A protein has these predicted regions:
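Phosphate-end processing signature that detects enzymes handling 5′-triphosphorylated RNA
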Residues: 1-158
Length: 158
């Protein structure tokens, strides 16, 4: 079984963007239940399908498979709407790679950073541009942003 261990944070400012290159992502959900999601993702000319289990702390079961690019567009049309669109940047800091997602569309204005860890107790030095931790807050799951987009939140994060 594949296990993903990651922590998620809000991002402040744009200092992280200075040396980062971004890739455009489109992703949708065939199932968006927080305890089990089935995600379809397009990254440039590649496609992926990912199955994720229930989160236990910062860990969850994850299985990801590459799918033909010809099928990813068809599968995205079958997904719950709207599709998530974002630019993902990779930023190295203190020996770890941080993935910073800058959302577009109905989630424009939301920027989050995720870092994958070897284990839940791994020490992590936080970059100055990292703000509040939101690892356990379901509303920040991409699968929930399709149902409750950031633009519709009554109170926006910092």
């Amino acid at each position: 079984m594949g296990v993903e261990i990651e922590r998620k944070f809000l991002v402040k400012g744009t200092d992280w963007k200075k040396e980062a290159k971004g890739q455009f992502y489109q992703q949708g959900y065939l199932s968006s239940h927080p305890e089990r999601t089935v995600r379809v993702r397009r990254v440039e000319d590649k496609g992926y399908i990912t199955i994720k289990g229930k989160s236990l702390g910062a860990s969850r079961a994850e299985y990801e498979y590459e799918i033909p690019s010809s099928e990813v567009l068809e599968l995205l049309h079958l997904c719950e709407q709207p599709i998530i669109e974002k630019v993902r940047y990779q930023v190295e800091y203190e020996g770890l790679v941080w993935e910073v997602d800058e959302f577009q569309g109905a989630n424009s204005g939301l920027v989050v950073a995720e870092v994958e860890l070897a284990d839940e107790h791994q020490d992590v030095r936080l970059p100055a541009w990292v703000d509040q931790e939101v690892t356990q807050e379901i509303k920040y799951y991409n699968s929930q942003l399709i149902k409750h987009p950031f633009s519709q939140w009554a109170i926006s994060p910092k």
